[in-house]
Amino acid sequence: MSEQPVLDTLADMTAASVDHNSLSPREYMLARVAALVAVDAPPMSWLANAPAISESGLTAEDIQGILIAVAPVVGGPRVMAAGGHILRALGIAIAVADAEIAEAELAAAEDGQS
């Protein structure tokens, strides 16, 4: 059994929903970000979606546009909360990716010295 069965299950559900829709990956993530804002998703939900958001090619401007578009429907406080969650999640995701790249470069350098 996995050490993180809940996260693994959520990742499987996300992968299945990506595979079974007619949207492009970019359109899919536009809709997903809007939904996360609308349901006032907690930081962990944003963190779980951060890799897919990054991989879809959404820019900071795209996310800003989503926040502006949904603000009249979901309200200012939700948009403000989402902004903070997005910043933390994407910041963490970037830091993790940077650490993984650094580890890979270090491993490659060590292999080259052997």
Report residues per predicted region.
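Acidic, glycine/proline-rich low-complexity segments that act as flexible tails and inter-domain linkers
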Residues: 1-30, 38-55, 79-114
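An amphipathic alpha-helical micro-motif enriched in hydrophobic residues
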Residues: 29-42, 64-73
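Short basic/hydrophobic patches in alpha-helices and adjacent helix-turn junctions
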Residues: 52-56, 69-72
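Winged helix-turn-helix DNA-binding recognition segment
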Residues: 58-63
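C-terminal structural segments of small proteins and small subunits
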Residues: 64, 69-88
